[in-house]
Amino acid sequence: MASRGKTETSKLKQNLEEQLDRLMQQLQDLEECREELDTDEYEETKKETLEQLSEFNDSLKKIMSGNMTLVDELSGMQLAIQAAISQAFKTPEVIRLFAKKQPGQLRTRLAEMDRDLMVGKLERDLYTQQKVEILTALRKLGEKLTADDEAFLSANAGAILSQFEKVSTDLGSGDKILALASFEVEKTKK
């Protein structure tokens, strides 16, 4: 009996996830090696990676316009790409966990950050930035936040994350989110 494209859809989804993982790992590696690179080399590599994300975004757009069975499964990837392109999230690891819809790992990362802050291994500014990113990602994944987390998010969410949150909520449909991501890519290129 024919699989009616289920095997192919599964393989395509796996390939897309691997491509997104590779690009997010590339961004994360770039941030980790930032001190070792000169400014021009860093900027050029980051620009190339964002261009690759843009091309990946265009591919997703084409796939979604022709295959509606993938729409729900790809929407998380689209939001992650949109966040990376608009640079709302600065932490590639958070983007990757968000794209893979892994709230448990996001919460584990949050606990590790709390511990690192207490022992002085993580600076307050970086902690605040990453905690806001993780809490925003958890909220977008439909996770319930504690009152303390909501208060922290309200007090510390910047304009960029607020804009990402508003846009992703208002748009809803994959096509509109992809259109916004494409717009952000074009804006970044200029």
Swiss-Prot record:
SUPFAM superfamilies, per the entry: beta-catenin-interacting protein ICAT
GO molecular function: beta-catenin binding
Signal peptide boundaries: none
Tissue: Ubiquitously expressed, with highest levels in kidney. Up-regulated in several cases of gastric cancers.
Key words, A-Z: Coiled coil
Coiled-coil portions: 2-63
Pfam families: ICAT (PF06384)
Keyword Coiled coil listed: yes
Keyword Endoplasmic reticulum carried by entry: no
Organism superkingdom: Eukaryota
GO process terms (BP): response to ionizing radiation
Cross-referenced InterPro entries: ICAT_dom, ICAT_sf
Subunit structure: Does not interact with CTNNB1.
Family note: Belongs to the CTNNBIP1 family.
Record protein name field: Protein LZIC
Gene name as annotated: LZIC
